[in-house]
Structures are given as structure tokens and as C-alpha cells.
Amino acid sequence: MSGSYSPQKDPQHPTQHQQFPPTPPYPSSSVWSGNLGENPVFIGIGSAAGASALTLLGVMGYRRYWKRIKNADYVTSELLRRRAWIKGIVTSVGDGDNLRLYHTPGPFFRYPFKIRSIPTTQKGLRNETISIRIAGVDAPENAHFGNPAQPHAKESLEWLRATILGKRMRCQLLAKDQYNRIVAVPYISRRLWWDRPLPLMMLKEGMAVVYKAGGAEYGPWGLDEMLKVEAEARDAKRGLWALRKFESPGDFKARMKLKSDVSEERPEKKSPSGWIALVKRLIRRT
């Protein structure tokens, strides 16, 4: 027989002499989990995720708890919707039922962490305070817009100034009125005891009456409780209830408005001029 027989190699059926590249071993899950802490890629991803989470939490915390509200324009609908609480210092009292509050969020306005201060000049406070309308009460009207002051307006204003000016207060934000004031329930802060609710204090001392106009807010007590406190002051003749003739602030404002409307509608009497005026002067002399 000429030549030797050599079988053809079938790639689909390798013989024992054929060898393929070895398959790389796959690590088990235990190996992966055991090496994650040493893998620089996973360390980098974890560090970046942690830093991002801390940054996000910091921004959210700052916006919710430490960002200062400069004035009523910065009070958002979201703050009013959730009836947020703020704290601050009363910088001025312009009427018997409103105040201006300098918002002091966070721990940095009080010792031992005090690193921020409150302006003391009118220039420094301009556009930096929140105009607060005390919810649920109505104090006697001061003189303004050409109208006279209502009886007991001075006493109510002086009492409110002596009670809260320069004091630290907590306020629950409720709404914004047509004058861009924030309707809120203010409490006088006390470190060692319960905070004092200012609206109830005003009613109890006879410095205001319950506000009953449309859209009124009565805080956590409700209208019935506030009317009860008002009735107790009336029976004891405290404050404005000691007046011999009392007119509610609402009735007073309505009367002043009616008076103003009538005066605007009344035509002005024109002084006579020319020969008519001359004749009248001659008649008066005779």
C-alpha cells in the first residue's frame, strides 16, 4: 500500500489530541461580595453616591429649616399649604393687631452658636422683615387715611408693644391677605415653660375682639373657644370692654368707609365769581 492513511480532522468532533483555549474561571458571588470593599471602582461609585446623597440632604435641610425668609414676598404657597412654623424676633409693632418679624432660622442667632446678628437700624431692616397679621383678632383702629383713632386704639397698641417688642416668637403661617401680610398664629417663646398664645392673650386682656370677617382664621382653638375667652373679658370689663359705649373695629371701619364714600359723592359748592359775587357782597353790607 503506497502512503499512509491519515483521517480528516472534524472540527465539530475534536479528538483527544485537539485542545481548545481554557475557559476562564468565573468567581462565585461570595468572591464578588468579599472583594467589593477592596475594588477601587466600587469604592469610587459608593463615595460619589454618598457625597451626592449628603449634598441633596443638606440642600433640602437648608431650604426647609435654615433658609431665612426675608419678607412676605418670600413666603411661598407651599409654606402656607403645610402651615409651616417659623421663629424670629419682633422688630416693630405698627398697629394693635399686626407686627413685623425678623426670621431667625437655625441655631446661629442664639448663644452658644451665635454667628449671625439682627440688624438694629431702619436701613438694615428695610425689606428684611415679615409683616404678620395676628390671626383671629381685631384691635381698635389707629388714626390713618384721614380717619380719627378709635377709642382704646392707643391703649391696645401700647400693650402690644410692651408685650412683644424685641421678644422671640414662633408663628404658624396660615394665609396671605390682600395687603400682602401673612396671617399667622404667633406664640411668645419661653425656654422653661409652654409658649404663650398671643391671640388668646389679647382677647383675655380686652385688647382686641374676635375677628369675624370673611376668610378669618382662628388657629388651633377655633371660633367657639375664642368667643368664650372674649366673653370672659367682656364680663370682667377688662380693656376696651370698660368703655361706656363700645363700637367693634369692624363696625368702626364700615362707618368710616361709608362716611368717606358719601363725602366723595357730595358735589363741592362752588364759590360765586364775577358780578354775582359783587352783588352778594353789597347785599351783606346793607
Swiss-Prot record:
Tell me which residues bind Ca(2+): D138
A GO molecular function for this record? metal ion binding
| GO cellular component terms listed in the entry, alphabetical order | membrane; mitochondrion
Name the Pfam families on file: SNase (PF00565)
The segments labelled Disordered in the record are 1-29
List the active site. R133, E141, R181
Q: Where are the transmembrane segments?
A: 41-61
Give the record's keywords alphabetically: Calcium, Endonuclease, Hydrolase, Membrane, Metal-binding, Mitochondrion, Nuclease, Transmembrane, Transmembrane helix
User: Can you give the residue ranges of the TNase-like domain?
Assistant: 84-243
Q: The organism sits in which domain of life? A: Eukaryota
Topology relative to the membrane, per the entry?
Single-pass membrane protein
Q: What is its EC number?
A: 3.1.-.-
The record's section on SUPFAM superfamilies has: Staphylococcal nuclease
The compartments listed are: Mitochondrion; Membrane
UniProt lists the family membership as follows: Belongs to the LCL3 family.
This chain's protein is named: Probable endonuclease LCL3
Q: Which lineage do the record's taxonomy fields give for this organism?
A: Eukaryota, Fungi, Dikarya, Basidiomycota, Agaricomycotina
